[in-house]
Amino acid sequence: MITTNTSSENWDLYRKVTHCLVGHTRLVLSYSGGLDSTVLLDILTRLKNNSDHFTSSPFMLRAIYVHHGISNYSDEWASHCFNQCKIRGIPFSVIHINCYNAENKQRNIEALARNLRYKKLYNRLNSKEILLTAHHMNDQVESLFLALKRGSGPSGLSGMSKNALYANKYRLLRPLLDCSREQLEMYAYKKKLVWIEDDTNTDTRFDRNFLRIKILPSIYQRWPCFNQVVARTAQLCRDQENLLNELLSESFQKLIDESDGSLLFIPLFQYSIPKRQALLRRWLLHFSMKMPSYQLINRIWKEVVLSRKDATPILQLDKYLCRRFREKLYILPVNMRCSLNRIELSWNIIHNVFILPYNLGKLIYQPLSINEHVPKNPFDLHLNINSSLNTSHDVFEKYKKVLTHCFVRSPKSDEKISIIFGNIDGLLYILGRNHGRHLKKIWQELGVPPWLRSRIPLLFYNKTLITAIGVFITHNGKIISKENTLWKISWLQDIISYKIFKNSVRYHLE
């Protein structure tokens, strides 16, 4: 066990870290082996082993090294980190990322590595675990300079937060954010800590290194307290941003539909330009996007909102799409840009579960006795199914799934069952309507957005359409009272599509 020395020069570091950890008992340290994270590892170890002495609540701690594969020394650094954790009795693991596979997709390798690193780290967090990084005050100064370079507003200039929540799911703490690099160096030398020097830290092609090596030393020499002043400025910007969120909260809640994340844009016309831009920005952040630029907000307004009434505008935002339908804006995964080609698939009823293509979920059929279950409504919705997609923090993957049910007549012995995606010809007669309509007209009447229409499974018995599952049922699919059984068809799908089914259920009830 490493002994504890509570000399006055170290007490400030212990106090700041202890204060940041209040209420958290399962910690995961992002440990690179560099000076900063080595200092934090050492402090956390001492607090863990001497919680009574430092009035710190007991906590569990483990460390993760992210192997980027950028440096030729990455394997050696991983071994070093393993040994440092071993002598402290801290569980340790390594995760690998490959920056070069995606380098052509994003020219900024620095940002790419950071994004991949956080994604992998978040995916490794277990229930109630929080992530710790060793960012300090000097890192905050660099972040502010980079924000200035990008022309950021108060949100960007607020820098890094000591306590942040990502995607409403992952907690990130930065216990050393109020500490200077000099404090950490002094601690490391006095404790005789061993750390690695990353050779890429001297490469001034990277923006942070350029600032750290070429720009900031002269500034610190001229104004020794510059980092403290910048930290205060960042906090003031953060306070202003929090206040703005508070003031806009009521307006924002009136505009957004939480069931599918869509935004009513008609009311935006009555607001001032700054308020309109602020609301659009908060809407995009609602999807865990990076801070949208001024130019991007303007493009959404001009190219999507203000496009012709009969147009179907699409604006790609990295891996997302911004689309307009009727009086709403939608954010969608980029893979929903195009409609699916017509697909026809046979369903062998020996298997009651049918896996749909294109990650559209699964269908499940269940024969029921008509005497035991006569539904009041041909549709039924059950939310909060205990099934989630995965642990990614992407907004379209973090949503729970929704189970949509519909009840139709059972197939006859000579009827083959198939699932079709895409458009079909001819007039359709659906429950709730007396006159026939083409499928396109039905989609329009039920308010189904164009990008979802080709993704809704159509259930056929032979050549006869029975139901667009969860949306409408045809007269040919109506339950026949003289039959002994009916079919319950369930579609397990992403909740992002829930709104169209809620609308169709309301339509049938009316």
Curated annotation (Swiss-Prot):
Pfam families: ATP_bind_3, TilS, TilS_C. GO terms for biological process: tRNA modification. It is an enzyme of class 6 (ligase). GO terms for cellular component: cytoplasm. It is found in: Cytoplasm. InterPro entries: Lysidine-tRNA-synth_C, Rossmann-like_a/b/a_fold, TilS/TtcA_N, tRNA_Ile_lys_synt, tRNA_Ile_lys_synt_N, tRNA_Ile_lys_synt_subst-bd. Transmembrane segments: none annotated. ATP binds at residues 32-37. It catalyses: cytidine(34) in tRNA(Ile2) + L-lysine + ATP = lysidine(34) in tRNA(Ile2) + AMP + diphosphate + H(+). CDD domains: TilS_N. GO terms for molecular function: ATP binding; tRNA(Ile)-lysidine synthase activity. Keywords: ATP-binding, Cytoplasm, Ligase, Nucleotide-binding, tRNA processing. Its EC number is 6.3.4.19. It comes from the Bacteria. Belongs to the tRNA(Ile)-lysidine synthase family. The N-terminal region contains the highly conserved SGGXDS motif, predicted to be a P-loop motif involved in ATP binding. Ligates lysine onto the cytidine present at position 34 of the AUA codon-specific tRNA(Ile) that contains the anticodon CAU, in an ATP-dependent manner. Cytidine is converted to lysidine, thus changing the amino acid specificity of the tRNA from methionine to isoleucine. This is tRNA(Ile)-lysidine synthase. The gene is tilS.
